[in-house]
Every structure is written in C-alpha cells, then in structure tokens.
C-alpha cells in the first residue's frame, strides 16, 4: 500500500475537559466532509449519459455507446469490491479526496476531442472513471463506523445516503448552466462539473478526519458508552486486507444475497439513468435544459423516497424490510412500463421519472 495512504497513528488522549467539545465539533465536521465529498463523486459519475445524445448526432452507434457506458458500471462494481479492502487499511481523509481527484481529472480528459474520438477511448476512460468512483463509498463507511456508534449509525447513515442523490440531481442543471455559459456541450457535461468536483476535493480534505483516536480522542463506543455485541479492545485493531477479504467478505452469505438482489435493482436504476437523456432527446424531442431538469427530478425524488421507505419499514411493517422492498419494486415495474408504453406528454414523462426515482433507491 502506498505509504501516504496509511491511517494516521493514534495520538495521546486530549485532556478530559477538551474531549467532549472536540468530539462534538469533529463529529459534525467529518459528517459534513463525507456528505459534500460523496455528493462531489456524483458530479463526475454519469456525465457520459448526458453527452450520449450529442454523440449519436455525431454519428456514433447507440449500441457501441452502450458498450462504452457499461465500462463505468463494470469497473465501479469491481472497484467497490476490491478497493473497499484497500480503503479499510487507508486514511479516509486521503482516500476519498484521492478518488474524487482522479475521477474529476479523467472526466476532464473524456471531454476533450481525443477523449471522445472513438468508442475505444471512451470505453477506457469510462472504465477508469468507474474504477475511481469505487473509492468514494468505502472511506465514507469507514468514517461513519469510527465516528458514530451503533445505535445512532442508522439515522446518520440514512441522512448521509442522501448525498449521492444531491450530487446526482445537480449534474443535470449544472450541465445546462455550463453549456449556456461556455457555449459547448462538452464544457457543460464534462468540464464544468469536473472543475466543481476538484474544488470539493479541497473542502473534503480540510473537513474529514480519519478516526477519533488519530485526533487524541477515545473510540466512539467508549465516548458514547454504546458497545456492539462482542466488542473488545481488539475491535479497534486495524486488520489486514487479507483478513477483511477472506474472513468478513467472502464467507458472509447474507452479504452475497444482498449483493445479488441489488444487482437486479441496479439494472433498472442505471438503465433509466443512463438512457433517459438519449431517449428523451431522440423520442421526445427534449433539449439539454429539459433533459437536465428531468435528470434532476429523477434523482431528487429519491430523497423523500428513501426517507419514506425507512419510515414505512420501521413503523408500518415493524422492521420487515423485505415487504417494503417488494412493494417498492412492484410499483417501479408499473411506472417503468407506463413510462415506456403510455407516457405521451412532458408532464407524464416527469411524473413517471419522479415516481421511478422515488421508488428505485
């Protein structure tokens, strides 16, 4: 592992009177840091989907463009799996900004004439972007685990999870604004979001801290007196990547069940997300501004949808998450079918996209 990514060493404890105010301040600070940082990742994740209608106009085949955009998802899945182990052995303060920096720089290159010159170059750059995107979630999860205790983590995680919808919602309007400012669809869809993402890199690095112990604070379990089952001092020892991978990932059957189920959800989520711009432009005749706001609606609707899903599963179905998921998925299938077969007006298009976004996340 690169030495500069190693977790910061534990520091001696601060004086007792400083621990509580420092802990409270840093908990808010690191949460804002990973929220803004992860939202920044989504400014440079799906830009290619917004560019596809223009690439089709340039003469590129839609099927080949589909192959190119699939590289992003393939690389993202592999990276999230493999880089998660690397992240567990790295400083979150460095790992998250590094991945966002590499994603933004690759997005800048993708927006150049050379980057968009062939399907091969687009495939390679999309693969790299997907790989670097896999460096966003794992360090955020590391921060959540170290700074928030077991019985508060669910609420904090659900709030933080909104970050990717915020970033995903902003990319559509941002592309429209960038195109209006710079007079180029390449600038609107690639360069402008990438430059903003690089600014977010600085903010994330300044705000995020790796662990409480690296700041002279006790473990979060000790601070809040909130210990998970079988907790011991050994729980705070940094494991090797091999131990994490073989002991806690490969042998976890429930994790595999969830992963397989999630793969089918992603077929719909990214199928709509990746192809909506091309579909709306070619079939519905939307311009970039209308596409941008449709994109915004899809992502933004996920925020209340996610919150309502949690409330429904907790309060109505008493923690039986599978029932809530089944209801949501049946409703998704209905609205996707309506969107595909019966949506004939911009209003109906918007209603369907909002409903799908509300339900799919």
Predicted regions and their residues:
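C-terminal ends and interior cores of transmembrane alpha-helices
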Residues: 101-116, 330-344
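Helix-to-loop junctions at the C-terminal end of transmembrane segments
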Residues: 80-91, 307-318
